[in-house]
Amino acid sequence: MLLLNASGCLDALTAPDIARSLDAFVTKTITPLPREGNTPPRIAETAHGMLNAIGLANPGRERFLHDHLPRLRELGIPLWVSVGGFCASDYADTCAALEDIEAIELNLSCPNVDEAADSAAEIVAACRRATSLPLYAKLSAAHADIAAVARAVAAAGADGLSLINTLRGLALDLRTLQPVLARGTGGLSGPSLKPVALAAVHACYAATQLPIVGMGGVATGQDTLELVACGARHVALGTVLFSDPGAPSRIRAELAEVDVEEFVAAAHDSEKLLEFRAKVVA
């Protein structure tokens, strides 16, 4: 099992020690052209997590490839690059330009990208033709039938899934009766997302049996094992990294007495899972 960061929740160049405490680092989503993102304020705390409306702020493909990626490689960390865009060719062209990395995560929840099963499959198929690198499709549980989207991207050539992206939410300032975020709504993340993530991972693993990076409200070793029990092969940390940068090391310590690889194998085999649970109870 790999422990990763959720895209956009950690800057490896400014916090290399935290990045090195993970098994692999996932970059912010890269788009063909630079994006400044949304007007501040674009982050707001909630009772059980946070909202963000960053707007895919990033340096753009060319600067990332020629400036950021070489510096990330110097850190000696296995790299996953998150790729975004607004049409299939945006994704495919960036994928074609990437090499010497561990995997590509396709952010299929970008603004203005229709995440219907056929659109997601079209993007994955275009990227599959453009690269031989492993492709992980990142999906949002906001879709009416996330398992159907998972099946579609699997058929189109995805090697794995990243589940889940944020859900749309709203925070209000009662003094002004205006949204806290300048954009209005934002992506909800944090502990409140975990039950949704568990359900999505369970449904998509049952539908595809693809390797899954589970994420959404992970803050403890128990959270990690719950996602694995639902079918995740790897786990990513997101919002917790803002409040507890030492979370990767702490979670590893919490899992020290568990044979995680045995648990992963058991979670993918119902009979073994029952045996493993019996051992835990004993």
PLM regions: where:
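Catalytic cores of alpha/beta
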Residues: 14-19, 89-100, 143-156, 202-208, ...
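Active-site beta->alpha loop and helix N-cap motifs at the rims of alpha/beta catalytic domains
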Residues: 47-116
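Glycine/Thr-rich beta-alpha phosphate-binding loop at enzyme active sites
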Residues: 50-51, 108-118, 149-210, 250
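Short beta-strand/loop segments at the ligand-binding rim of alpha/beta enzyme cores
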Residues: 1-4, 75-81, 130-141, 205-215
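Glycine-rich beta-to-alpha transition loops that act as phosphate-gripper elements at the mouths
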Residues: 8-9, 82-86, 139-145, 164, ...
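Alpha/beta catalytic cores of nucleotide-metabolism and tRNA/nucleoside-modifying enzymes
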Residues: 188-212, 219-282
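N-terminal capping/small domains of soluble enzymes
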Residues: 1-78
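Conserved, mostly hydrophobic/aromatic
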Residues: 5, 25, 64, 81, ...
